[in-house]
């Protein structure tokens, strides 16, 4: 089936009352009729026990995401940040190393530097080019971490080449597919990535109303290289032998949900399940508008530089054509310096907010917001300059948006 068909049909459970929509299971715990039934649920993990671990509403969302991303398994969590943390918790142990792309989302860099460091994990930042990654690999490397589209540098890595390299090295390629819009724009697992993490807060939600995140993984024998999957668990089982490729998502569920409690609300799961039904339509419209704006603002005398992967002359265009369904709904304008960016943002009659994927166009100044906690050198390495403005294009009329941008540029 095609993506748009799966988006409305996949994951919808049969309902004893014949409901044609997804019910919200707003309960904390699930009862047992007998001692033996409770014992079996705890022993096997089948069925429902406590909503922190799993619930039917979240399960339906996981099934839909699996279909849309082409995944073996999916685990949904409270936010995209929770998803990234849970995936890395499942992969890493003290003394391990991660090779990460320069130019990641600011909070991901913060997670690496302020949390993973407490676990004794070292992160090496390199350009997300295969040779640079190869040179950074060591015997301690357990993961390579990149974004589908760098936020906000808008560079697109060669996912297939990186996946081949990671497979040869016996380490996991983890891709933050937030900019891939739940598979509507990109499906990294199809290109060989072992793990996908993503924020569902963005395009999956579509209205900036809920938080959510997901970890997805594919069929692979890679987990045989990780000691945590070859040692007995609390049930006395060897995870790899008992679960094969599902040992990784099960560890994500155990660590991220059961033990760390980063559970997704069933209300949020319901809204995200619903949002996925229209994500492909919204992303296609937003991408068309983003290209329209990029083509008309490119070369504007008040714009020092414009980045949009859908433009043929953009540095990311070659990889974008291969990996993305379109140029995407994000573009950036560099207005030259902080003062010019401030005047532009003060004049434009659109929302200024540190979010993406909303039905409304959102603008943000990464230098003073999303990347402000990084040192200046790190910001510049991430492609963030004092004059840069990131634009997440919404569903407004393209001509109206162009008029608003041109009006604001007159104030620069």
From Swiss-Prot:
Coiled coil region boundaries: none
Family (UniProt): Belongs to the trans-sulfuration enzymes family.
UniProt pH dependence: Optimum pH is 7.5.
Keywords assigned by UniProt, alphabetized: Amino-acid biosynthesis, Methionine biosynthesis, Pyridoxal phosphate, Transferase
GO function terms (MF aspect): cysteine synthase activity; O-acetylhomoserine sulfhydrylase activity; pyridoxal phosphate binding
EC number(s) stated in the UniProt entry for this protein: 2.5.1.-
GO BP terms: cysteine biosynthetic process from serine; L-homocysteine biosynthetic process; transsulfuration
Enzyme class: transferase
Cofactor(s) listed in the protein's UniProt record: pyridoxal 5'-phosphate
Residues bearing the modification N6-(pyridoxal phosphate)lysine: 202
Biophysicochemical property: temperature dependence: Optimum temperature is 70 degrees Celsius. Stable at high temperature. 80% of the activity is retained after treatment at 90 degrees Celsius for 60 minutes.
Protein name per its UniProtKB record: O-acetyl-L-homoserine sulfhydrylase 2
Function, as annotated: Catalyzes the conversion of O-acetyl-L-homoserine (OAH) into homocysteine in the methionine biosynthesis pathway. Has weak activity with O-acetyl-L-serine, O-phospho-L-serine, L-serine, O-succinyl-L-homoserine and L-homoserine. Shows a very low CTT gamma-synthase activity.
Catalysed conversion reaction: O-acetyl-L-homoserine + hydrogen sulfide = L-homocysteine + acetate
Regulation: Inhibited by the carbonyl reagents hydroxylamine and phenylhydrazine. Also inhibited by methionine and propargylglycine.
């Amino acid at each position: 089936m095609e993506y748009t068909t799966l988006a409305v049909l996949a994951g919808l459970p049969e309902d004893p009352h014949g409901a044609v929509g997804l019910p919200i299971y707003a309960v904390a715990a699930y009862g047992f009729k007998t001692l033996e039934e409770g014992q079996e649920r705890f022993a096997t993990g089948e069925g429902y026990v406590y909503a922190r671990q799993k619930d039917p509403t979240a399960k339906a969302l996981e099934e839909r995401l699996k279909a849309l991303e082409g995944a073996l398994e999916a685990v949904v969590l409270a936010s995209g940040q929770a998803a990234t943390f849970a995936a890395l918790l499942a992969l890493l142990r003290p003394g391990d190393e991660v090779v990460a792309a320069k130019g990641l989302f600011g909070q991901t860099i913060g997670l690496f530097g302020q949390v993973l460091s407490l676990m004794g994990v070292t992160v090496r930042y390199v350009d997300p080019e295969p040779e640079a990654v190869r040179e950074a690999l060591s015997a301690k490397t357990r993961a390579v971490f990149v974004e589908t589209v760098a936020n906000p540098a808008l560079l697109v890595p060669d996912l297939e080449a990186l996946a081949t390299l990671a497979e040869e090295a016996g380490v996991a390629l983890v891709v933050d597919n937030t900019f891939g819009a739940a598979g509507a724009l990109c499906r990294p697992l199809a290109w060989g990535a072992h793990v996908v993490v993503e924020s569902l807060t963005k395009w999956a939600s579509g209205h900036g109303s809920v938080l959510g995140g997901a970890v997805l993984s594919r069929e692979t024998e890679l987990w045989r290289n990780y000691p945590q999957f070859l040692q007995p668990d609390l049930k006395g089982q060897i995870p790899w032998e008992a679960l094969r490729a599902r040992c990784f998502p099960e560890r994500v569920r155990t660590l991220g949900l059961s033990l760390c409690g980063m559970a997704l609300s069933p209300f949020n799961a319901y809204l995200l399940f619903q949002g996925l039904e229209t994500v492909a339509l919204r992303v296609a419209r937003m991408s068309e508008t983003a290209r329209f704006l990029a083509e008309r603002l490119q070369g504007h005398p008040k714009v020092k530089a414009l980045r949009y992967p859908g433009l043929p002359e953009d540095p990311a265009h070659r990889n974008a054509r291969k990996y993305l369904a379109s140029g995407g709904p994000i573009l950036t304008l560099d207005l030259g310096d902080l003062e010019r960016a401030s005047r532009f943002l003060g004049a434009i009659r659109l929302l200024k907010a540190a979010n993406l994927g909303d039905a409304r166009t959102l603008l943000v100044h990464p230098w003073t917001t999303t990347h402000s906690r990084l040192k200046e050198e790190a910001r510049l390495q991430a492609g963030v300059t004092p004059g840069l403005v990131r634009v997440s294009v919404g569903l407004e009329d393209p001509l109206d948006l162009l008029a608003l941008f041109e009006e604001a540029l007159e104030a620069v």
